[in-house]
């Protein structure tokens, strides 16, 4: 039998353990059925379940400032009432956050209500998800349908997005435009693993950042796997990017690097590896340094350097009216490239390529 003294000692030890517990251990699991309740109660929860939430018009599902270690689960169908505004529909920040989707869940943006074929012009359309300051965190297994405009805006360090499905296929016939899947900027350490995307703009667009890995992606119907446009922003450096083991089909481009005319910056340590393309309407591989006001001018400048670029096992076919490969560099600004097993066929050969390293073919 335990003595009173030993029981007292045990109780004091337990109290000390509780007193020293981290905040997340003291918090509980919460289920929210409204966006307002989630915003008001998020700080007191170690696990947040978002249960069939209908987000009011013009309102962000605000999960910013989450306590470190919080788990977020999307359950049922998440919907958003209609208003013409900039968004985002969802915003999340914090450290060591784990975001998942429960079995059978759907985040249905019903973007057709906004689509008018004009993208960032025309009706004001909300962006979908801001992962700004969502550091050392993960987003896994989300099923997303019909974003009004861009899907994920990533500005975070050490973030991993895995098994994300973005199905904007309806936008092909209903006026979806500028529905980028993953826009990455001002980030260090971004991993995007096994995404499935059907959209009407870039599957991946990296405007700035370092240590970025995109692997095992399926990209359908958009503008391909892009770096840029680089230049003209507060951060104009893209470094150490690997894009690999992915397919790009029925898209405008497959592999693309573009920089802004007259700007400064750098693109370096870039690898595209094991990329398979089909049904490409514009360019299989395009690297150009002539963008101005969002459009190519045909007049490249050399203020943004593109160095240490490796293309290996980049293969597939483009449409007969498309161009296999187009390389337009400024004087001396493209260097130290490696090309190995780059085989793009089916389209035209460009006669306008300029200033590209001799190891490449155009």
Curated annotation (Swiss-Prot):
The active site is at residues 201, 223. Its EC number is 3.2.1.15. Keywords: Cell wall biogenesis/degradation, Disulfide bond, Glycoprotein, Glycosidase, Hydrolase, Repeat, Secreted, Signal, Zymogen. It holds the Pfam family Glyco_hydro_28. It is found in: Secreted. Coiled coil: none annotated. Residues 22-27 form a propeptide. Glycans are attached at residue 240. Residues 1-21 form the signal peptide. The keyword Cell wall biogenesis/degradation applies. The lineage of its organism: Eukaryota, Fungi, Dikarya, Ascomycota, Pezizomycotina. One of its GO terms (molecular function) is polygalacturonase activity. It comes from Aspergillus tubingensis. GO terms for cellular component: extracellular region. The gene is pgaII. It is an enzyme of class 3 (hydrolase). This is Endopolygalacturonase II. Involved in maceration and soft-rotting of plant tissue. Hydrolyzes the 1,4-alpha glycosidic bonds of de-esterified pectate in the smooth region of the plant cell wall. It catalyses: (1,4-alpha-D-galacturonosyl)n+m + H2O = (1,4-alpha-D-galacturonosyl)n + (1,4-alpha-D-galacturonosyl)m. Its main location: secreted. One of its GO terms (biological process) is cell wall organization. Disulfide bonds join 30-45, 203-219, 329-334, 353-362. Belongs to the glycosyl hydrolase 28 family. SMART domains: PbH1 (SM00710). Gene3D superfamilies: Single-stranded right-handed beta-helix, Pectin lyase-like.
């Amino acid at each position: 039998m335990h003595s009173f003294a030993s029981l007292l000692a045990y109780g004091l030890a337990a109290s000390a353990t509780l007193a020293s517990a981290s905040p997340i251990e003291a918090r509980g699991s919460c289920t929210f059925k409204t966006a307002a309740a989630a915003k008001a109660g998020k700080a007191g929860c170690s696990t947040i379940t978002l249960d069939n939430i209908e987000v009011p018009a013009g309102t962000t599902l605000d999960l910013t400032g989450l306590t470190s270690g919080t788990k977020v689960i999307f359950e049922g169908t998440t919907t958003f009432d209609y208003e013409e505004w900039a968004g985002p529909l969802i915003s999340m920040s914090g450290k060591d956050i784990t975001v998942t989707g429960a079995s059978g869940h759907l985040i249905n943006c019903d973007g057709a209500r906004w689509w008018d074929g004009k993208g960032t012009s025309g009706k004001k359309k909300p962006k979908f998800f801001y992962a700004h300051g969502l550091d050392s965190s993960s987003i896994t297994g989300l099923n997303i349908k019909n974003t009004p405009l861009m899907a994920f805006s990533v500005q975070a360090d050490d973030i991993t997005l895995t098994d994300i499905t973005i199905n904007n296929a309806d936008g092909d016939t209903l006026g979806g435009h500028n529905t980028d899947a993953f826009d990455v900027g001002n980030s260090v350490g971004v991993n995007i693993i096994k995404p499935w995307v059907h959209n009407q703009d870039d599957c991946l667009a990296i405007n700035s950042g370092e240590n970025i890995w995109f692997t095992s992606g399926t990209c359908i119907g958009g503008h391909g796997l892009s770096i840029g446009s680089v230049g003209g922003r507060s951060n104009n450096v893209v470094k150490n990017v690997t894009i690999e083991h992915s397919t790009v089909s029925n898209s405008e481009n497959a592999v693309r690097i573009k920089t802004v005319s007259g700007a400064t910056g750098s693109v370096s340590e870039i690898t595209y590896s094991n990329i398979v393309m089909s049904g490409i309407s514009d360019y299989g591989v395009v690297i150009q340094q002539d963008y101005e006001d969002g459009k190519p001018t045909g007049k490249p400048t050399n203020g943004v350097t593109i160095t240490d670029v490796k293309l290996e096992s980049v293969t597939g076919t483009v449409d007969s009216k498309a161009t296999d490969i187009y390389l337009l560099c400024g004087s001396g600004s493209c260097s130290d490239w490696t090309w190995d097993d780059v085989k793009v066929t089916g389209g035209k050969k460009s006669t306008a390529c300029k200033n590209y390293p001799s190891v490449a073919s155009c």
